[in-house]
């Protein structure tokens, strides 16, 4: 049995392994942990992940006139990466064809539901290998997410709220934070 987490977003959300490692984006993996736990508790068996993705809910500007056919909608989706799901997918090619039955027909162009390019031999293109995970890799990411969440919970329980915003390259969340006057984080000293 396989499960898939889909988090619908109106903006351009994406996740990287670095985001998960630094605890910046735990949402998809947290949802996967909850899904696996709920499935195990209700069904009495384990579930393997098929994918964890952000799916964009857009209201694209489409010329007025006749309704779009499925083929035309797919053509529009192919033209815009903004319509593509973003996240992690199983490395099982057959499973990916169950998510999108036309997955293999997109080849190097990537489809909207499984935006992973394939080579002529129907294996995953090297440029998209970072988007696929085997069951063990999903498990490691879930266990790590669980560990980070447990640490956060312990810190909250202990009354520990250190002012330690992340810095990734030169980016900090403080730039856009409405509460920087409350926390008094001074980037010139820290």
Task: Specify the residue positions occupied by each region the protein language model found.
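Structural signature of nuclease core domains in nucleic-acid processing machines
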Residues: 1-190
